[in-house]
Design a protein with these regions (language model features):
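Conserved catalytic submotifs in the C-terminal HATPase_c
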Residues: 3-13, 56
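Conserved micro-motifs of the catalytic ATP-binding
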Residues: 14-17, 96
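ATP-lid-like helix-loop hinge signature
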Residues: 34-70
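Short conserved segment of the HATPase_c
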Residues: 67-69, 81-93
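Acidic ATP/Mg2+-coordinating residue in the GHKL
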Residues: 76
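Short alpha-helical Gxxx[C/S/T] motif in the catalytic ATP-binding
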Residues: 104, 108
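Detector for a conserved hydrophobic position within an alpha-helical segment of the HATPase_c
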Residues: 112-113
């Protein structure tokens, strides 16, 4: 079983955004994390996904300064993203799985961009972190 850890900052105000689209963007990342944690190379008793929200102050998103932003991190302890695809991860048709369509993260990036936000990824074996930053003010 995969353990889901929710670490939410209750002080974050409602985002001026389309909630359903943001849910879709987040679920695309969570789905990938679950698939990575289900791979044969992972000890299935230790798999975990952390959903963490925090306020970020003084953020520059797409060349625009914002006094306040919300940061959503999706962290998993899976095998990591292969180095040969990490730099092109958000482009269409890029997938680390033979059965993957390569569309989920491309859609995520498009949704976050439409909300004037930023999505980034850092990955190594045992620690992959997607970070979504969205303007609040």
């Amino acid at each position: 079983a995969i353990k889901l850890i929710r670490d939410y900052d209750p002080s974050i105000p409602p985002l001026p955004a389309d909630a359903e689209q943001l849910m879709q963007a987040t679920l695309n990342i969570v789905r990938n994390a679950m698939q990575a944690l289900s791979s044969p190379s992972v000890d299935h008793d230790l798999g975990k996904i952390i959903l963490r929200t925090r306020i970020t102050r003084n953020a520059t998103l797409n060349s625009t300064f914002h006094r306040l932003a919300a940061r959503i991190k999706i962290i998993d302890n899976g095998p990591g993203i292969p180095e040969e695809i990490i730099h092109n991860l958000f482009y269409p048709m890029i997938s680390g799985r033979p059965e993957g369509t390569g569309l989920g993260l491309s859609i995520t990036r498009d949704i976050i961009n439409r909300h004037n936000g930023l999505v980034e990824c850092q990955s190594r074996p045992g620690a992959t972190c997607f970070s979504i930053v969205l303007p609040l003010a």
